[in-house]
Every structure is written in C-alpha cells, then in structure tokens.
Amino acid sequence: MRRGQRFTPVRLRRWLESGRGTGFGANYQPWHQVTRADPGSRGRSHLINGRLSRQHHLLSDGEEEAFGFATMLPGLSDLREQHPLSTEDRIGDDVAVACLAGSPWIEGTLSIASALGLKHPTVHKAGDCEPWRFSTDLVLHLDTPSGSSEVIAVSVKQSDELKRQRTLELLQIEREYWARQGVTWILLTEQLYSKDVGLSIRAGLSWTLGQPQALAAHLNLCAALAPAFDGRTLGDVLTLIEQRCVVSQEAAQAIFWQSVWRGDTPINLAMSVRPGATFEMLSATSFWQQNPIAARRSAWTL
C-alpha cells in the first residue's frame, strides 16, 4: 500500500464496480487490499496465506492478532477481512442475512447515521463527492454444533484511538449497522488481552496457516501428551513430539501449534514462547477465555 495514494470518489466507485467486497471463501475480494495501488494504512500491513486458499489482507499488527484469534474458533467456515458496509438501504445478500429473523432488509450507513444524529463521512475531490464506505476488519461465519450458523463482526482499534470523539461516532454507526442485522459486534483493543498472548498468537500463526495440515494421528497424539507438557520448555516439548511422532523438529512445531489452535493442547498463551521458558497447562475453559473473540469480550462501553 502506498503512502502517497489517496481515497477519491473515483477510486471508491472503481472498487465497487470491480467487485471488491464480494464473494465467499476463496473468491472473496477484500474492500481494502495490501497492494501498491491502494492508499496506505497507518499500521504495518500483512499478507497472510489462510485456510481459504487465498491471501488475507490485514492492515495492522492488531488485525493480524485478531485474525489469529479468529482462526482458532471452532466451526469457522468463512472469514472475510476488510468487509464493506452498504451505504444505502437495500435487500441484501450480505453475510449477515443468515442471522436475520425476518426480512433480509439491510439498513445502510447513511440512514443509520441520520437516525443517530451523526454526520456520515464523505470523500471529495475536484467537486466530486461520494459517501465514505465503512468497512469492518473481520466478519466471521461459524457453524455451531446445533447445526445453525453465527456471524461475528470484529472491529480492531488501538485504545488510544478511542479517546477521539469522532472515532467513537464512526464506531457507533458501524456497531448499529450490525446490531440491526442481529449480528454480534466486537470492538477489539490491545487492552483485552496481554501483550505476551498477542506475541504467542503471532508466533503460532506461521505454523498453523500456510502450512501442510498435520496428520490427525499426530494431532491426537499431541493432545494425549499435553498433560505432560506442564512445566516443560518448548524445546523439551518439541523433542518429545519429534520422538513420539517420528518427525522433524519443523514438523513437530506444526503439530504442536496446530494442536494448540484446536484447543487440544491448552497452554497458557501468556507464557513466553522462547525455548527456555516453561509451559503452564490450563483447563479448556481457561484456555478459551484467553481468546477475546471466543469469549465475546468487547471494549465497547457506550
């Protein structure tokens, strides 16, 4: 993404016409993308290979950590980052339609902003004007054990950003957009989890996504060995997995982290992942409480 690029009415219309923000699974096109032609983000951008056979476009370290938390969720069937919100009221084919109890009518951000008495942002250039298109950082589809589906919308912010009144107003519009569709909306900040947990998530991502799926037999064996990991170092744990699964250390890393991601090896993610640090094993409930999305924790307090 280039710092010199700017959002313009023409650019927004071009994105809409090209199909950005549409599609499912491997065919989804994010609204904002990490490309040389896109305006730059304020954070450090990331392109990550995921389970959906495409690259995911993440615009900050916080979004990368949120993405890691999201990919751990049981039943995750689709993940769409940089998901655009409709500006106009319409009959929708939006991801949230499956959650609607009644008519699939989507109220656009222009109507919602007016109802809330808030100014809707716009983009101007040379006398041309276009309503700004809001986007939600992550929109998750979950298949539940009961056979139903759930949609979770996640917005990622730094806590310092919430000191600005205009930021809160824009978030209020985004929250209301999803609330009117019956969708759970989570505001995720770094204060909802420790820095060490975030570091563990980012360390584990490289071994869980874009890597070959570990054999089910190896994952099951790792889960069976998990109680013995308590008090051991990462190096000791990897050696044990290597020996019992008869694999390389690289393969042992993938087996270990993929087992953690499934919740079958419930480690304390706040413990350092350096080779000399020791692990603490947790109950399944305590393990999932470390994940703010799984726990449905939100920084929104208004």
What are these regions (language model features)?
Residues 1-302:
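Electrostatic, structured charged patches in enzyme active sites and in nucleic-acid/phosphate-binding
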